[in-house]
Every structure is written in structure tokens, then in C-alpha cells.
From Swiss-Prot:
Residues 1-92 are annotated as: Disordered. Keywords: Leucine-rich repeat, Methylation, Repeat, Ubl conjugation pathway. LRR repeats lie at residues 321-342, 347-369, 373-394, 398-419, 423-444, 446-470. CDD domains: F-box_FBXL16. Residues 94-139 form the F-box domain. Gene3D superfamilies: Ribonuclease Inhibitor. The keyword Repeat applies. SUPFAM superfamilies: F-box domain (SSF81383), RNI-like (SSF52047). This is F-box/LRR-repeat protein 16. Substrate-recognition component of the SCF (SKP1-CUL1-F-box protein)-type E3 ubiquitin ligase complex. Interacts with SKP1 and CUL1. The modification Omega-N-methylarginine is found at residue 92. Residues 47-60 have a biased composition (Pro residues).
Length: 479
């Protein structure tokens, strides 16, 4: 894991995205564990963290020393004395170490800034290492960051006690092997019961490694496998546990129809399934049964090129309680498939039809007529959608988020239909080439709009953005 330079200047802060954040390393003064499985960590060794930069507040003539920052006595100010000083030095009130104040203050900093602030002093670290400041964040650890190289060239596993103190319940491991995963399990004290979510990306985990991981880490209920090409469908059959409620598999070349059979039979409590596999066919979707029908509420079939309307039939009959469905990139699905969805999945709140080139305005008529609870609709790259389709959507009072990125046939007349959608909070028109400045300016009538995306829109001029800033002051306009 990366850490600030020895000169004290931190690297540029990294921003959380989708719950994932790259955390800098923590010089917490603790020894590192041996690479040998099961070997206890070395005894704690005192380690002095690098001194933080001392920046004087505007109201102070001289910068505070580290002692003062930690609540100790302030040194006298330099310069000519104004008079004789009698008695002991006045002690600064320990505001900088008041835990009540710090507990409120630290909420205003990003995750990466908190990592740096935790190095200021023990009092700050004690406050910052409370799990509440790290809830919802997932540390990302690359394989090379899991080991320290000793002077003799040997490697030892890094100390993960700082992560345990902050109570992280999920990890994303990138480029790891079976051995790396075993070392992680042996050296992270919360791995057996405390870790709820594991994500493995671009890793060489095998069937055996997957089985050991899920057998040892009994707390894992959310699993993501992305770009892992060394495990097979047999590995899923031998390792999947009924406790898993969320599973995501993408870019894993050995995943095909039999993987869905394993998922449907072994995961009766599955609530969320995300699958991106080029070789999955309609046959796989027939494996879903009533067992998943009661529990599964989210299904994402991403770029499953072989799935047709026949596969959609299997989905709508087996999973009637879906509230979120994505058919993004399922290029063989047509308007008839969307009609099946609209007629049978009346509980849907989110529907993603992006990158479905066969979808036309007729599909939007089905959506508008039957999906009265729908709050989010994604139509990115649906190149056959026209202004007529938008006229159907304008009747949907429940819709709050509408994505029309790169819908190249949408024109100003279609935007006029959207002006009737008073509950709309998010609208994306990125890449729509036929929209003019005049047509876009009418969007100021949507006073409840919170986010408007206009990237790569020829009609989005600097004058238009200025106009929006004046008439849509509460809306984030993405240029």
C-alpha cells in the first residue's frame, strides 16, 4: 500500500468511487507478520511517524509546535518581549486532543485525508481509528503491497492490525494468488468471522484457492470475482455456500451455463446476482427456480450476447419479485423481450436497457404503460430511440432518473416532452448530437432537477452553463 513520502507531503488524495478507496499505508509502529502461514506477528517495535507539516493558522503569529498541537504547553512567541513575564507558562487548553471536538471535526475529511491525519499523534489516531469513520469503504490491496522486502531479499507479510482496528468488513485484492489469499487469512485477525465482503480482481485464484477462502472466511456473504481466469465451474460447485447473498462474476472465461446451474442450486438466499459472461445462453436462465424467486431482487445480465427473448421469458417467470433488472449489452433482446418484462415484473424500480441496439420507441410504450413504480431507466446507446419514445416516458410520474447518453436521434422536440416530468431529479443527455442551445435552455423548467449531464453535447455552450447556474442554482450541471 502506498504511503506519504518521507518529506511529509502526501500524495494527491484519492476519491472514493462506488465504495472503493485506495488507502495509503499506515506507519502504526507495529511489526510485520512472517510470510510463513500461521507464524505469529513479530513483537511491536516503536516507530516514530514523520512529523506533520506545521502550518500556522491565520490568527497566529507563529506556528504551533507539535507539543502544543497535542495539548501540551505552548512555547513563548519569539520577538521582543512586551514586558516581564512572571509565573509558569500558560498552558494551552487541550482543544486539539478533545475527543468530542475531534469526533465532529474528522467527519469533514476524505478517507485519504483521514489516513494522513492519523499520523499526527496518538490521540488523533485513537479517534480516527473508530470504525464509524470507515464504514462503507473497501480497502484495495494489490499483491505487491501485501509484502515487505527485507534487507536479505526475503519477504514478510505486512501487518494488517491497523485495518483490524478500523473494523473493515470488506476487502478488494488485486492480482493475488492462492498463497496470497492464505497469507491474508492467517494475518488478518478479523478474516474468519469479521469480513463480510471479498472482491478478487485480475487474480490467479484456482478452484482449490476459492474453496479454501470460502471455507475459512465464514463471514463472507458478498463475493465478487472479476478477471479471474484460473477457476472453473467445478470450483463454484465445490465452494459456493448457502450463506452468500450477493454474487458478482465478470470477465471470467471459464464461466458459462453450468455456472448458473451451480448458483441456482447452491445459493437459495441469493438476493443480488451480477453476471457478465459472453458464453451464457438462454439455457442457463432456465436453471432459476422458485427458490430464487422469493429472495432475488436484483439481476444484472451484462453483455450476455447470446441471451435472447427466450431467456427473458425464463427470467420473468422464475424471478417475479425483481426490483432491479439490467439487460445492458444483451444485443439480441428486442421490443418483445421488453414487453415481457413490463407485463410480468411490475415491482421493478430500476431498468437498464443500455447498449440494446434493437430497442425502439415501442419498447418505451410498454415500459410507460405497465411499470408504474419505475424510478430509474437507462437507455444509453439505444440508437433507435426517437422523440416519440420520449413522449411515452413523459407520462411516468414515478421516474426520477433518466439516462439518454448517445441517443443520437433525440432532438429538441423530444426535450419538450420531458418538461412534464416534474419529479425528475437526474437527467443525462451526454453525447446527444442533435440538441441545440435553445432546446436545452428549456430544461430550466425542471426546477427539482439535481443533476444534469451535458458532456459532449454540441449545443451545450459556456453561455448555456452560465444560464443554468442562474436559473438552476441547486442543480449540478456536468459539462
Amino acid at each position: 500500500m502506498s504511503s506519504p513520502g518521507i518529506d511529509g507531503d502526501p500524495k494527491p488524495p484519492c476519491l472514493p468511487r462506488n465504495g472503493l478507496v485506495k488507502l495509503p499505508g499506515q506507519p502504526n509502529g507495529l511489526g510485520a507478520a512472517s510470510i510463513t502461514k500461521g507464524t505469529p506477528a513479530a513483537k511491536n517495535r516503536p516507530c516514530q511517524p514523520p512529523p506533520p507539516p506545521t502550518l500556522p493558522p491565520p490568527s497566529l503569529a507563529t506556528p504551533l509546535s507539535r507539543v502544543a498541537l497535542a495539548g501540551g504547553p505552548c512555547p513563548p512567541a519569539s520577538g521582543p518581549a512586551s514586558g516581564p513575564v512572571s509565573g509558569p507558562p500558560v498552558e494551552r487548553p487541550p482543544l486539539a486532543t478533545d475527543e468530542k471536538i475531534l469526533n465532529g471535526l474528522f467527519w469533514y475529511f476524505s478517507a485519504c485525508e483521514k489516513c494522513i491525519l492519523a499520523q499526527v499523534c496518538k490521540a488523533w489516531r485513537r479517534v480516527l481509528y473508530q470504525p464509524k469513520f470507515w464504514a462503507g469503504l473497501t480497502p484495495v490491496l494489490h499483491a505487491k503491497e501485501l509484502y515487505n522486502v527485507l534487507p536479505g531479499g526475503e519477504k514478510e507479510f505486512v501487518n494488517l492490525q491497523g485495518f483490524a482496528a478500523r473494523g473493515f468488513e470488506g476487502f478488494c485484492l488485486v492480482g493475488v494468488s492462492d498463497l496470497d489469499i492464505c497469507e491474508f487469512i492467517d494475518n488478518y485477525s478479523l478474516s474468519k468471522k469479521g469480513v463480510k465482503a471479498m472482491s478478487l480482481k485480475r487474480s490467479t485464484i484456482t478452484d482449490a484457492g476459492l474453496e479454501v477462502m470460502l471455507e475459512q472466511m465464514q463471514g463472507v456473504v458478498r463475493l465478487e470475482l472479476s478477471g479471474c481466469n484460473d477457476f472453473t465451474e467445478a470450483g463454484l460447485w465445490s465452494s459456493l455456500s448457502a450463506r452468500i447473498t450477493s454474487l458478482s462474476v465478470s470477465d471470467c472465461i471459464n464461466v458459462a451455463d453450468d455456472a448458473i446451474a451451480a448458483i441456482s442450486q447452491l445459493l437459495p438466499n441469493l438476493a443480488e446476482l451480477s453476471l457478465q459472461a459472453y458464453h451464457v445462453t438462454d439455457t442457463a436462465l432456465a436453471y432459476f427456480t422458485a427458490r430464487q424467486g422469493h429472495s432475488t431482487h436484483t439481476l444484472r445480465l451484462l453483455s450476455c450476447w447470446e441471451i435472447t427473448n427466450h431467456g427473458v421469458v425464463n427470467v420473468v417467470h422464475s424471478l417475479p419479485n425483481l426490483t432491479s433488472l439490467s439487460l445492458s449489452g444483451c444485443s439480441k433482446v428486442t421490443d418483445d423481450g421488453v414487453e415481457l418484462v413490463a407485463e410480468n415484473l411490475r415491482k421493478l424500480r430500476s431498468l437498464d436497457l443500455s447498449w440494446c441496439p434493437r430497442i425502439t420507441d415501442m419498447a418505451l410504450e410498454y415500459v410507460a404503460c405497465d411499470l408504474h413504480r419505475l424510478e430509474e431507466l437507462v437507455l444509453d446507446r439505444c440508437v433507435r430511440i426517437t422523440d416519440t419514445g420520449l413522449s411515452y416516458l413523459s407520462t411516468m410520474s414515478s421516474l426520477r432518473s433518466l439516462y439518454l447518453r448517445w441517443c443520437c436521434q433525440v432532438q429538441d422536440f423530444g426535450l419538450k416532452h420531458l418538461l412534464a416530468m416534474r419529479n425528475l431529479r437526474l437527467l443525462s443527455l451526454a453525447g446527444c448530437p442533435l440538441l441545440t442551445t435553445t432546446g436545452l435552455s428549456g430544461l430550466v423548467q425542471l426546477q427539482e432537477l439535481e443533476e444534469l449531464e451535458l458532456t459532449n453535447c454540441p449545443g451545450a455552450t459556456p453561455e448555456l452553463f452560465k444560464y443554468f447556474s442562474q436559473h438552476l442554482p441547486r442543480c449540478l450541471v456536468i459539462e
